[in-house]
Amino acid sequence: MSGILTRWRQLGRRYFWPHLLLGMVAASFGLPALSNAAEPNTPAKATASNHDQSVKVNFSQLALLEASNRRPNFTVDYWHQHAIRTVIRHLSFAMAPQTLPVVEESSPLQAHHIALLNTLSAMLTQEGTPPTIVRRVARAHFTPQASFSVPAWISQAQGIRAGPQRLS
């Protein structure tokens, strides 16, 4: 009897909980966060008509769609973040190389795994902040030269001096 319970616990630890967390994280991406004030249930017909209205978008309104706030009630959910961090931790342990990679034997797949591990560790260590819209961008002031010269252009473009500065 204890052997069956041990096997069941191992199955849950290895397969059930990581896949359940991965499913929770995958299902929650792209869904709007639920606000504290729940809206009353609407009939199916009204929901379908609202959905159809949101699909009909003119091309002239694309800028308005881009400027609109995609997640107006953005809230940071502690348990959602915990599930994401746990899945990232599971993935990073599962993808970690078992031996130290040798420089001569590195393949593109190993490089891809290392890059993915670096990205996952960066996601774990940096603090998550909601996206913000940048309203004003500082523009660089461009001052054109008074006259065009080939040596000056080559020196600026390629970082070398091509010929004398002045032709006498």
Swiss-Prot record:
N-terminal signal peptide: 1-37
UniProt GO MF annotations: translation regulator activity
Pfam families: SecM (PF06558)
Keywords for this protein: Cytoplasm, Periplasm, Signal
Predominant localisation class: cytoplasm
Places the protein is found: Cytoplasm, Cytosol; Periplasm
InterPro entries for this protein: SecM (IPR009502)
Gene Ontology cellular component terms for the protein in this record: cytosol; periplasmic space
Function summary: Regulates secA expression by translational coupling of the secM secA operon. Translational pausing at a specific Pro residue 5 residues before the end of the protein may allow disruption of a mRNA repressor helix that normally suppresses secA translation initiation.
Membership in a protein family: Belongs to the SecM family.
Annotated protein name in UniProt: Secretion monitor
Lineage: Bacteria, Pseudomonadati, Pseudomonadota, Gammaproteobacteria, Enterobacterales
Annotated gene: secM
